[in-house]
């Protein structure tokens, strides 16, 4: 197996997986925003030609002016599988905190070849405690080191 660091492709795949949104709010959404992600590490192992698994970690800052998630910061990490047909699927977690020290975490995943991924709350403290929020995310733009994803969902 050939193990190497990758930049653009891994970040694109990972950012596609990670959450966040902007004014692309869907009808049922009552929260939305943008997640700005800065890659810390990315390592890809090529199992066979065009069949890879990548481990990715990034700093994350959410911007969502009308929700409790606005200006929460933290980290996201995940695993991205790319199959020989060129489709990717992924899963991972994000953990963030706000200026008051309250924390929240989410799990996220995207199905093989999907344009959008899904996220859901997994825990939190303070204002985030007991939340059962969930929604979608979609890659917007990236350059290999930084990425922006749009997100939306149903938030309590």
Summary of predicted features, one role per range:
Residues 20-22:
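N-terminal signal peptide c-region/cleavage motif recognized by signal peptidases
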Residues 26-156:
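Beta-strand-enriched cores of mature, soluble protein domains
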């Amino acid at each position: 197996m050939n193990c190497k660091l990758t930049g653009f492709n891994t970040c694109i795949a990972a950012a596609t997986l990670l959450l966040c949104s902007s004014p692309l709010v869907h009808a049922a959404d009552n929260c939305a925003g943008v997640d700005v992600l800065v890659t810390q590490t990315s390592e890809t192992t090529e199992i066979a030609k065009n069949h890879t698994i990548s481990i990715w970690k990034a700093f994350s800052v959410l911007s969502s002016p009308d929700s409790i998630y606005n200006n929460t910061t933290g980290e996201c990490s995940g695993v991205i599988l790319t199959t020989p047909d060129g489709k990717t699927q992924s899963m991972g977690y994000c953990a963030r905190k706000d200026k008051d020290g309250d924390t929240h975490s989410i799990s996220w995943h995207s199905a093989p070849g999907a344009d959008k991924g899904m996220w859901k709350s997994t825990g939190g403290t303070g204002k985030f405690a007991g939340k059962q929020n969930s929604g979608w995310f979609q890659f917007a733009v990236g350059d290999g080191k930084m990425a922006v994803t749009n997100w939306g969902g149903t938030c309590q």
